[in-house]
Amino acid sequence: YLSAHGRYTTIHLRDSQKHITTKSIGEIEELLPENNFIRIHHSHIINVDFLYKIIKNDGYIVELSDNTQLNVSRRKQEDLMQFLKNM
């Protein structure tokens, strides 16, 4: 998954490695294949191949296969559900 930190983006890899880039998360989003990646929050993009489950609480939380949990913003909840429905 990817996480934004100001003007930097951290790319989190399967093996717990992290790479930091000076590209914004928006710039990277434009380069990613749309059928594998979805933006779930202003600060997060996930690879749906590693989506383990969705937890509904007050909002939605995605849990990835490495047990990472990320909040889904209210504005992105419907996008996520539609994306998964169309897979």
Predicted features along the sequence, with ranges:
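Eukaryotic intrinsically disordered, low-complexity regulatory linkers and tails enriched in Ser/Thr/Pro
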Residues: 64-66, 74, 78-87
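Conserved binding/recognition cores within well-folded domains
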Residues: 1-65
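Alpha-helix boundary/capping detector
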Residues: 54-58, 71-72, 77
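A short macromolecule-binding patch
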Residues: 19-23, 70-75
